[in-house]
Amino acid sequence: MAVSLREYRARIKSTESMKKITRAMELIAASRIIKAQQRAQSAAPYARELTRAVSAVATYSNVDHPLTREPENSQRVAMLIVTSDRGLAGAYSSSVLKEAERLAEKLRGEGKTIDVYLCGRKGEAYHRFRNRPVVRSWTGFSDQPSYDAALEVGTTLIDAFLDEEGEHAVDEVHVVYTRFRSMLLQEPTAVRLLPLEVVEGEERPASDEVLPLYEFEPSAEAVLDNLLPQYVQSRIFFAFLQAAASELAARQKAMKSATDNADELIKKYTRIANQARQAGITQEISEIVGGVNALADAQAGSE
């Protein structure tokens, strides 16, 4: 019984150590979520004004730009999947990968071939384990994305879309990422990025507001050539920021659940250890009483 008691005490000690780690990771994720939300909010004005500028050019000119041109027969699709670099985030990566599988099944049903692009080591490991080809992957920034990373990814996807005869030329570009709705809800989302469908925001001008007349210098084509790539990159950066906040929220929830489970295990092991200790004490008392009775019987027999 003493050996069993030592085992339970060792389990309690190891569980307490694990609880300290998960609690620390929960607090770190909570603090980073606030920063991730602030980054997303600070990037919103730029994205909003950029969308308005692109919408203005598209509305007040009749330019046919390659990034907005619908293909006559779409046959090849690029799919960017945004996962995490690290684990301990619950079902975060598996959920976005399931959404990517659903999208891939839908696209294959339409007779389209898929080129996979990945962000995050979890996506890399998923495809490597299944021996699935990946055109290109990026890692190292899933929880703290930079605009430079979005610029590199966006440039790669734009080049693949504009390339008409290359090995990895595509007719469409889709992005699968996790959208941050709230601390309790993160939603895997799939959106078509290219060809672009520029939509104005929900804000509408007031009835008495005078809408401006635009003049494009040097030309509407030149303005679009500069704005549209930035627009694509800003949307990718938005997806990265949303995914980062979602990853941190998922990690906080997972670590809180692990901490709560550790508390339950500690209570369980403590209760069992106390029962084992009480059983050991009871057995020792019984043995002492039995020994005393046996000694008394022996003395009575000798008399």
Swiss-Prot record:
**Protein function:** Produces ATP from ADP in the presence of a proton gradient across the membrane. The gamma chain is believed to be important in regulating ATPase activity and the flow of protons through the CF(0) complex.
Q: Name one GO cellular component term.
A: plasma membrane
Query: Could you name the domain of life of the organism this protein comes from?
Result: Bacteria
- Family as reported in the entry's similarity comment: Belongs to the ATPase gamma chain family.
Q: Which InterPro entries match?
A: ATP_synth_F1_ATPase_gsu, ATP_synth_F1_gsu
Q: Name one Pfam family in it.
A: ATP-synt
- How does this protein sit in the membrane? Peripheral membrane protein
Quaternary state and interactors: F-type ATPases have 2 components, CF(1) - the catalytic core - and CF(0) - the membrane proton channel. CF(1) has five subunits: alpha(3), beta(3), gamma(1), delta(1), epsilon(1). CF(0) has three main subunits: a, b and c.
Q: Where in the cell is it found?
A: Cell membrane
Entry's Gene Ontology BP terms? proton motive force-driven plasma membrane ATP synthesis
Keyword tags: ATP synthesis, Cell membrane, CF(1), Hydrogen ion transport, Ion transport, Membrane, Transport
Q: Which organism is it from?
A: Nocardioides sp. (strain ATCC BAA-499 / JS614)
Name-wise, this protein is: ATP synthase gamma chain
A Gene Ontology molecular function term of the record = ATP binding
